[in-house]
Swiss-Prot record:
The keyword ATP-binding applies. GO terms for molecular function: ATP binding; kinase activity; phosphotransferase activity, alcohol group as acceptor. The keyword Methyltransferase does not apply. Catalyzes the specific phosphorylation of 1,6-anhydro-N-acetylmuramic acid (anhMurNAc) with the simultaneous cleavage of the 1,6-anhydro ring, generating MurNAc-6-P. Is required for the utilization of anhMurNAc either imported from the medium or derived from its own cell wall murein, and thus plays a role in cell wall recycling. It comes from Vibrio cholerae serotype O1 (strain ATCC 39315 / El Tor Inaba N16961). This is Anhydro-N-acetylmuramic acid kinase. InterPro entries: Anhydro_N_Ac-Mur_kinase, ATPase_NBD. Pathway: Amino-sugar metabolism; 1,6-anhydro-N-acetylmuramate degradation; Cell wall biogenesis; peptidoglycan recycling. ATP binds at G13, T14, S15, L16, D17, G18, V19, D20. HAMAP family: AnhMurNAc_kinase. Belongs to the anhydro-N-acetylmuramic acid kinase family. Keywords: ATP-binding, Carbohydrate metabolism, Kinase, Nucleotide-binding, Transferase. Its EC number is 2.7.1.170. It catalyses: 1,6-anhydro-N-acetyl-beta-muramate + ATP + H2O = N-acetyl-D-muramate 6-phosphate + ADP + H(+).
Length: 370
C-alpha cells in the first residue's frame, strides 16, 4: 500500500466564478476531502480575463501582467486554504493547479491550448512543489487536452450493471460516461452555465440567475431554441472540447440578431438549450436497468435545469453527486489534486479514448519552490 499523502487542487473554470481549492488525502485509489475553500476573483481581474477569453485585442504586456496576477491569485487561494484548514505547507506533497484557460483550439493545423497563471509564483510564495500545465502534452500527442477529469471519475465512481454518467455543469458542460464494461467516454457537450450567466449579467447586472428565479418567469422560444442548436459544434463527433472562445456573449448576441424575444424568455430558452444539448448526448449511452446521471458543478444548484434534465431523461436517476457522498462543488479541484499525485509519481493521467491522444501520458510540469 502506498504512503498516505496530502495534495491541494486549485481550479478556476470557464465560469470565472472564483478559485476553488481542495485539500485531499490520497492513498492508492482512496481519496478523502479534508478541507476546501472558495476564493473570490477580483472584479477587475475577472473583466480582464473575460476580455481576453472572448478574443478582444490585447498586448504581450497585458498578457504578462495577467500571468503574474493569476499566479498571485492562485497562491493567495492556497494560503487562505492552509489558514482555513490549520495545515502547514510542509504537510503538503504538492499543489495541482489547472490555471485559467484563456483560449482552447485543439483542432486544425496548429492546435494549442493556453492556461495561464505563473506556477513559479505559486511554488515560491507557498513553499510547495506545484504541478501545472496539464493539458498541453495531451494536445502535443494529438489529443484535445480535455476533458481530463474522466480518469478521476473512473476512480471514485463505478458502473457495475448500469451506465453512470458524471455531468459537470460549469461554464461549459462536460460528461464522463462510465460504462458497465469498464469503457470510459468523455467530452464537452456544449454550454453549461456560461450563456445563462452572461445574459443575466448583461440584462440584470447579476452574476447569475440564483435558483433560476428569473428563467422560471419566462417561456421557451421554440424558434430560437432550434436556431441555437444548429451550431456546428453539436454535430462534431467525439472526442471534442470547447470553451468561452466559441460560446460567449458576442456569439449569443449574433444568434439573437434576427429574433425579437423578450429578455426573460431568452433566459428560459438558454436554460432549455443547455438541458437539451446535454440530454441529446447523454441519452444514447443508457445501459442496464437504472442508468444514473450524477451532476456536479454550479449547474447542480439550478433547480430548473435539474428539473428539466430529469424530465428529459425519465428512465434515468438524476441526482447531484452529493447524494453519492462526493461534494460536487469541489470535484474539479479534487481532480487536479489527484492529477498532481499522478504526475509526482510518474503515472499516466490521460485517457486516450477520451481525449484522442495517441498514447497514455503523465501530464503536467513540476515547479519546485527552491
Amino acid at each position: 500500500m502506498a504512503e498516505r499523502e496530502l495534495y491541494i487542487g486549485v481550479m478556476s473554470g470557464t465560469s470565472l466564478d472564483g478559485v476553488d481549492t481542495a485539500l485531499v488525502a490520497l492513498q492508492d485509489d482512496n481519496i478523502e476531502l479534508l478541507a476546501h475553500h472558495d476564493y473570490p476573483i477580483p472584479a477587475d481581474l475577472k473583466q480582464r480575463l473575460l476580455n481576453v477569453c472572448i478574443g478582444q485585442p490585447t498586448t504581450l504586456i497585458a498578457m504578462g501582467e495577467l500571468e503574474h496576477d493569476l499566479g498571485h491569485l492562485f497562491s493567495d487561494a492556497v494560503l487562505a486554504l492552509l489558514q482555513h484548514s490549520g495545515y502547514r505547507a510542509e504537510h503538503i506533497r504538492a499543489i495541482g493547479c489547472h490555471g485559467q484557460t484563456v483560449f482552447h483550439q485543439p483542432t486544425g493545423t496548429k492546435p494549442f491550448t493556453m492556461q495561464i497563471g505563473d506556477a513559479n509564483i505559486i511554488a515560491t510564495r507557498t513553499g510547495i512543489t506545484t504541478v501545472a500545465d496539464f493539458r498541453r502534452k495531451d494536445v502535443a500527442l494529438g489529443g484535445q487536452g480535455a476533458p481530463l477529469v474522466p480518469a478521476f471519475h473512473r476512480t471514485i465512481f463505478h458502473a457495475e450493471q448500469s451506465t453512470v454518467v458524471v455531468l459537470n455543469i460549469g461554464g461549459i458542460a462536460n460528461i464522463s460516461v462510465l460504462k458497465p464494461n469498464g469503457e470510459v467516454v468523455g467530452y464537452d457537450t456544449g454550454p453549461g452555465n456560461m450563456l445563462m450567466d452572461s445574459w443575466c449579467q448583461k440584462e440584470r447586472n447579476q452574476p447569475y440567475d440564483k435558483d433560476a428565479l428569473w428563467a422560471k418567469q419566462g417561456s421557451v422560444n421554440a424558434a430560437l431554441l432550434s436556431h441555437l442548436k444548429q451550431d456546428h459544434y453539436f454535430a462534431l463527433p467525439a472526442p471534442k472540447s470547447t470553451g468561452r472562445e466559441l460560446f460567449n456573449l458576442p456569439w449569443l448576441e449574433t444568434q439573437l440578431a434576427t429574433f425579437s424575444v423578450d429578455a426573460t424568455d431568452v433566459q428560459r430558452t438558454l436554460c432549455e438549450f443547455t438541458a437539451q444539448t446535454i440530454v441529446e448526448q447523454v441519452a444514447p449511452f443508457a445501459e442496464g436497468p437504472q442508468p444514473q446521471l450524477l451532476v456536479c458543478g454550479g449547474g447542480a444548484q439550478n433547480p430548473l435545469l435539474m428539473e428539466r434534465l430529469q424530465a428529459l431523461l425519465p428512465s434515468w436517476q438524476v441526482a447531484p453527486t452529493t447524494q453519492m457522498g462526493v461534494d460536487g462543488d469541489n470535484m474539479e479541484a479534487m481532480a487536479f489534486a489527484w492529477l498532481a499525485q499522478r504526475r509526482i509519481h510518474g503515472l499516466p493521467s490521460n485517457l486516450p479514448a477520451v481525449t484522442g491522444a495517441s498514447r497514455l501520458a503523465s501530464l503536467g510540469v513540476i515547479y519546485y519552490p527552491d
